[in-house]
Design a protein with these regions (language model features):
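Divalent cation-coordinating acidic motifs and surrounding scaffolds
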Residues: 1-254
Length: 254
């Protein structure tokens, strides 16, 4: 699970979230791995990974060396080992783009992919985040001309046309999950935006107090079928982009 737009400079919100997850959740224990605060101005954000420590382990991570200063918030790349014979490791590359520089940042994201896959010699990579890749920030023509669209091997799991915004007045596919690697893509069972206002019976305003985006997720099958029967959901890896769940309670965003 990857959280974005975390602006907590006191470093108190994530420990609180972990404490509550491990207190009430029955699928833990959970651990976290965070970047530094990133940004060009006084407003800064961090990327935060949350993961089940008995199912995954951080093998390595690094902040992308953005020598040309193309990213407002350069990706914090992480390589996980997984307790799965089907998918023993996975690289995640999160990015929250700036609306005015979406095209430049998303094309530069391809270079981050090359850097990460070359560093760890893997093709199983997921690029994910609030790409702002729709509506006024990026036209369909410019979207289709991105390197991540024209280069073979990438599957945009959150399809064009999927609304990832909470407001009824908007219908934009800002948030994306992009899978690279034939093997990884073969494990994909589903992808969706999670309409949490509907699931939790919230009004639009109540939902906006939490986030103006829906979380997006992919479902990966991490166990082989036995006698033709697919494994249950517990044998899958869920990756969610939360922007940001429980924000009002935990102070994850301003």
């Amino acid at each position: 699970m990857v959280l974005q737009e975390v602006v907590d400079s006191s470093d108190s919100a994530i420990p609180l979230l972990l404490r509550e997850l491990n207190r009430f959740g029955d699928s833990g224990p959970y651990a976290s791995h965070s970047s530094l605060l990133l940004g060009r101005s006084t407003y800064k954000e961090k990327y935060v990974y949350l993961y089940r420590s008995h199912e995954a382990e951080v093998q390595d991570s690094y902040m992308y060396d953005d020598q040309d200063d193309l990213f407002t918030r350069e990706p914090f790349v992480c390589w996980f080992s997984l307790r799965s014979k089907v998918l023993p490791s996975l690289v995640l590359v999160p990015l929250h783009t700036t609306p005015k520089a979406v095209e430049m940042e998303l094309n530069a994201l391809y270079d981050v992919f090359l850097d990460a896959s070359g560093r760890w010699q893997t093709k199983d990579v997921i690029l994910l985040g609030d790409f702002n890749a729709d509506c006024a920030s990026l036209t369909k023509k410019r979207l289709d001309n991105l390197v991540l669209r024209t280069q073979a091997g990438f599957h945009w799991a959150i399809a064009d046309g999927v609304d990832t915004t909470v407001r009824a007045s908007t219908h934009c596919t800002y948030d994306r999950i992009v899978l690279h690697g034939e093997h990884l893509q073969s494990l994909l069972r589903g992808a969706a935006a999670f309409d949490f206002p509907q699931s939790f019976g919230l009004t639009e305003q109540e939902a906006l107090n939490i986030s103006d985006h829906y979380p997006v997720e992919v479902d990966l099958v991490l166990s082989r079928a036995v006698h033709g029967v697919q494994p249950p959901c517990l044998a899958t890896l869920w990756l969610s982009l939360l922007l940001p769940l429980l924000a009002s309670q935990l102070g994850l965003v301003a």
